[in-house]
Amino acid sequence: MTNIRKSHPLMKIVNNAFIDLPAPSNISSWWNFGSLLGICLILQILTGLFLAMHYTSDTMTAFSSVTHICRDVNHGWIIRYMHANGASMFFICLYMHVGRGMYYGSYTFLETWNIGVILLFTVMATAFMGYVLPWGQMSFWGATVITNLLSAIPYIGTSLVEWIWGGFSVDKATLTRFFAFHFILPFIIAALAMVHLLFLHETGSNNPTGIPSDMDKIPFHPYYTIKDILGALLLILILMLLVLFAPDLLGDPDNYTPANPLNTPPHIKPEWYFLFAYAILRSIPNKLGGVLALVFSILILILMPLLHTSKQRSMMFRPLSQCLFWILAADLLTLTWIGGQPVEHPYIIIGQLASIMYFLIILVLMPATSMIENSFLKW
């Protein structure tokens, strides 16, 4: 009799994806982030569902409904903070996952990589709209500032912004539609993640050496299932430490003040995971230029396969490229720091230099360094 795991139409899909999947024998913990992102997504959908049961998307009651969740709903406070800090964990895993892909040359799997970039944009859009929902000061002004950026688009800009707002300012219509989109997008993300996985399993996983590992594969279960469970436990440990000991560490105190269109907060800034892009946006004095730089700072990932000039796939045996990669990582941390600072003397120039460095490293220095390394090996 055939094993039900291998014969049942549904079980067969699960089996081929998570049990009998041939995986390289040498993939490191950097390959854990895919499964961690899956766990984050499930966690966000579940906590979000329970929050949506008590939330009201009306400008008059949105803020007080969130307060009601924290004070009156059974375990509402933990659900709310797991959802808020779960977003931070999601982005930590996302950036690590993308960084891993850049370091080990995983972007040569074109379909997988491009769907990954689309996923990144979708998750960023979802997180932005979710931040608007509590209707605090930073929610309102963040929504106003970021949606206003679209007015930089020539000719149709202003009409486009008013169409998104559903009026002449961020108001009830905006909040309601943002709630609707924030609810539906995670399911679209889940579907895209399955397509992402489908394309990955067409080629098989990359590995730290970047060399094909077809002759040295091991079954995913039990080797990588147990490894993923360890990663998941660490993720949940860090998340619960945040939730139970410092739930507001990564948030903005301004968001505990109800939204007031007549009072602008002194420093409008997004959540920490968008600060690097926000710093790039602010470093260009021109509005349209800033918006283009902001979009291109993420869209540049699409160009990674085109910018790959090395004869080797991975950076494992390329010390000069490794050095540049970690300079890029430090540069992104610098941009994140600058994004949270006020627009005044030392910060403006630091932000501009860090922004130039970001594009220079990816577009010029990395491809040039790869060519130099090729010449070292007489290739």
Swiss-Prot record:
Origin species: Tragelaphus scriptus
- Subunit structure, as described in the record: The cytochrome bc1 complex contains 11 subunits: 3 respiratory subunits (MT-CYB, CYC1 and UQCRFS1), 2 core proteins (UQCRC1 and UQCRC2) and 6 low-molecular weight proteins (UQCRH/QCR6, UQCRB/QCR7, UQCRQ/QCR8, UQCR10/QCR9, UQCR11/QCR10 and a cleavage product of UQCRFS1). This cytochrome bc1 complex then forms a dimer.
The cross-references to InterPro entries, in alphabetical order and at most eight, read: Cyt_b/b6_C, Cyt_b/b6_C_sf, Cyt_b/b6_N, Cytb/b6-like_sf, Cytochrome_b, Cytochrome_b_C_euk/bac, Cytochrome_b_N_euk/bac, Di-haem_cyt_TM
Q: Which UniProt keywords apply?
A: Electron transport, Heme, Iron, Membrane, Metal-binding, Mitochondrion, Mitochondrion inner membrane, Respiratory chain, Transmembrane, Transmembrane helix, Transport, Ubiquinone
Q: What is its main location?
A: mitochondrion
For this protein, the record's PANTHER family field holds:
CYTOCHROME B
Task: Tell me what topology the record assigns in the membrane.
Answer: Multi-pass membrane protein
Protein's recorded name = Cytochrome b
SUPFAM superfamilies to which the protein is assigned, alphabetical: a domain/subunit of cytochrome bc1 complex (Ubiquinol-cytochrome c reductase) (SSF81648), Transmembrane di-heme cytochromes (SSF81342)
Question: Which positions bind heme b b566?
Answer: H97, H196
Gene Ontology molecular function, alphabetical = metal ion binding; ubiquinol-cytochrome-c reductase activity
User: Its family?
Assistant: Belongs to the cytochrome b family.
